[in-house]
């Protein structure tokens, strides 16, 4: 119970997990077991099966040495079966590169096919005032379609949708951009700053980035291209997802334009999203690790705020400390 309490209160960030000593009775039972089999005890497998090493040793108390060895054999079998098998597993997902429509999902409509118009943001309502009139857009803002529109309109902020939800275990996040457009809009004076963002900033809706709903990998690459396109005009990209795998292409795109290590990231999340042992490289639990590993953001310029719940555990906090990353648990936030 104390371990769970420490985690829920955020105290695991400040204390190392105590190592459970191996009981002498267990040492006696394994003294004749081959060393290569005992290596499984150093893996996460015992804790995965029984929660803690203390519980594991407790479960072994009534077993004979032969039964203990059989239990270790079972854990080894599970560990081996969990690994990649080149004889039975696919290392990559095959694609039909002969398909004439391979890139049709992200092929742009040539401007020559559109009615000729002067570049710049397009207002989609016929009315001067009122909210929720005309076609729904982010923040009730005018629409921009091409980079030329951003440049001609001297746009400060381009809000763009990224309806991707395949980097998560659950579906539905792809409806985020649609839901945000259906909200009342944005406007009025913020009471904390006495500033009306819609008046002091030129804001546009830049549409949704195309997503291949059959491939997270292809989609994320295209998101990176489109976010980079916005940033190259000098406009600030404001991305509405979508699941959290999108953090990686968003951050990488800014590094493409401004240079690796030239900016920082403030990451508000209950989890640190720096997992590194999962089968898929592009998920909602790994964008921070990839952004740091590939050098897009220096770890000391990554700030985590709001960490709570069961993840990260001791290894995650150790990784952040070793890399100089700053973090603030939700317990700290509530105190302040």
Indicate where each model-derived feature is located.
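Sec/Tat signal peptide C-region and signal peptidase I cleavage site
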Residues: 11-15
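Conserved alpha-helical scaffold segments that buttress catalytic/binding sites
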Residues: 17-159, 164-336
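Bacterial N-terminal signal peptides
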Residues: 2-10
């Amino acid at each position: 119970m104390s371990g769970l309490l420490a985690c829920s209160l955020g105290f695991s960030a400040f204390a190392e997990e105590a190592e459970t000593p191996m009981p002498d009775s267990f040492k006696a039972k394994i003294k004749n077991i081959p060393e290569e089999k005992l290596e499984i005890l150093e893996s996460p497998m015992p804790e995965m099966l029984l929660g803690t090493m203390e519980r594991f040793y407790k479960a072994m108390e009534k077993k004979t040495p032969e039964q203990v060895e059989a239990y270790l054999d079972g854990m080894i079998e599970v560990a081996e079966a969990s690994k990649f098998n080149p004889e039975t597993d696919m290392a990559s997902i095959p694609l039909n590169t002969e398909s004439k429509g391979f890139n049709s999902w992200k092929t742009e409509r040539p401007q020559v096919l559109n009615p000729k118009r002067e570049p710049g943001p397009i207002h989609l309502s016929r009315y001067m005032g009122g909210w929720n009139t005309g076609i729904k857009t982010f923040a009730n803002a005018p629409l921009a379609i091409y980079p030329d529109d951003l440049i001609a309109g001297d746009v400060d902020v381009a809000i763009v949708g990224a309806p991707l939800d395949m980097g998560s275990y659950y579906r539905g996040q792809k409806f985020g951009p649609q839901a945000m457009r259906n909200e009342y809009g944005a406007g009025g004076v913020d009471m904390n700053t006495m500033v009306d963002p819609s008046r002091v900033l030129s804001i546009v809706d830049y549409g949704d980035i195309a997503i291949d709903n059959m491939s997270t990998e292809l989609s994320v690459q295209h998101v990176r291209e489109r976010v980079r396109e916005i940033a190259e005009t000098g406009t600030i990209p404001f991305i509405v997802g979508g699941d959290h795998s999108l953090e990686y292409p968003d951050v990488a795109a800014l590094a493409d334009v401004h240079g690796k290590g030239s900016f920082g990231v403030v990451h508000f999340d209950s989890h640190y999203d720096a997992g590194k042992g999962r089968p898929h490289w592009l998920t909602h639990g790994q964008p921070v690790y990839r952004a740091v590993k590939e050098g897009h953001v220096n770890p000391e310029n990554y700030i985590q705020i709001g960490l709570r719940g069961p993840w990260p555990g001791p290894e995650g906090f150790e990784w952040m400390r070793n890399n100089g990353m700053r973090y603030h648990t939700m317990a700290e936030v509530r105190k302040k």
